[in-house]
Amino acid sequence: MRSIIRMLCICLALCLAMPALGEEAQQSAAPIVRVWLRRLGLTDRADLTLDGVYTAQLPSGVEMSFPKGSQVTVLVRSGELYLFYEGMSLHAGTALQLIRNASESTESEGIRFVEGGNFYPGDLTLTLTDQGLLRPVCTLSVEDYLLGVVPYEMSNSFPLEALKAQAVCARTYALSHVRGDPYYDLEDTTNDQVFRGVNLTYGNAIQAVRDTAGVVGTYKGELASCYYSASNGGQTELVENVWSGRGDWSYYQMTDDPYDLENPESVVRRATLKKSGEDLPEAFLTLLAQQLAEQMTAKGFDPTFRGLRVDGISAMELHTPKYDAPSRMWSKLDITFTWSGRTVTYPPAATATPEALPLADAGDQEISLFAQGQATATPAPSAGASAQPTQTPTPTATPAPVYGEWESMGETTLTLDVFPQLVRALEISISGSDNEMLTLTETDSAFRLEARRFGHGVGMSQRGAQWMPAMYSKTY
């Protein structure tokens, strides 16, 4: 009886749902995007809090309406979906849609996957992947989508004008990268743009989205590809240097970005090489030894970093840009240094000899190893006798290698590959993409290499965009 009454109440709530006349209705003309909420990592269960009036629609045509605040659970059982709500269960088959009903409420309205967490302001479609896992896809206006993108692709604490620039880039990217996939248009990960739902406390990001509503970047009347990355290292990169494929990318140029360089929050990795040759990293010495291996072997030296000593570094120079001018992504480093080598010998290891076993006394019983059918009785232990374990020979330690005296080999100049050998050996690789912008400075006692660029470097630098309005009053 209670289940019947509850079902009647749900149906009544559906009948009373009315269209909205507020701001949400005004945004109805905004383009719609479908976002696969892959970052949530759902497998066979979704616990949902409906912060709004929602209607569940099943492929069979059955509909159920849920009042705001309802908590529902969707489970995968034997390859199909089941919806559970207040003791009731509903077989949903292979697809389930939760449609948000229009409302005049100015408060948050959407679906929360974590109680008290961010909300997703749109419809939710649940289907199954080929692996039988939940595929949650949120369908919402691009303007609402940006509310969950801008403060995560760029911090809400950034200047408002920087956030506006981010909103325009993110909006243009979303609309120009809509997939033709039957299930979704965008992912909520860095495969597209990070989307984590809406947090209404991020007022700066919300204002930036509202103030730039509908603004996109275009080229020749078409949506442009407005790329951005965390930091370009002081110079923007060309699209064709990062991604393959054809296209007219003439609106992207390789230009200097002093704002990214000036921003102290731009990522920088540093390595200091003393001119005295002291305290050089083992990996760097290994790199030099590999370059000198033939010469070291010919002299009988140990061709590893242990057989090499750098006595002094007199010159270093970065050169050979990876791409055409004006690129400053150097791919080679010349290093001039004096060095010494030494021989190594390995003494033969001693062989451990186990102690000889004692011979049997003449009076001991003779036992034939080949006797058949005779069982030997187990002797009773003597009073007070204890078992004596057989001693295992102690292993002999490997003798330490014996090195000869250092022999000076004079001065030499080597050309090292910056990518990937040098940046890995000096541990100045930032993102592992082998695209860092390196600079070299010299002091009285050392050479210092600095590596910059976090991301692909194409388009807007987020750190540069942060610095421009903060220090130079630039607008988006």
Regions found by a protein language model. Give the residues of each.
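Conserved, single-site charged/polar hotspot
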Residues: 2-476
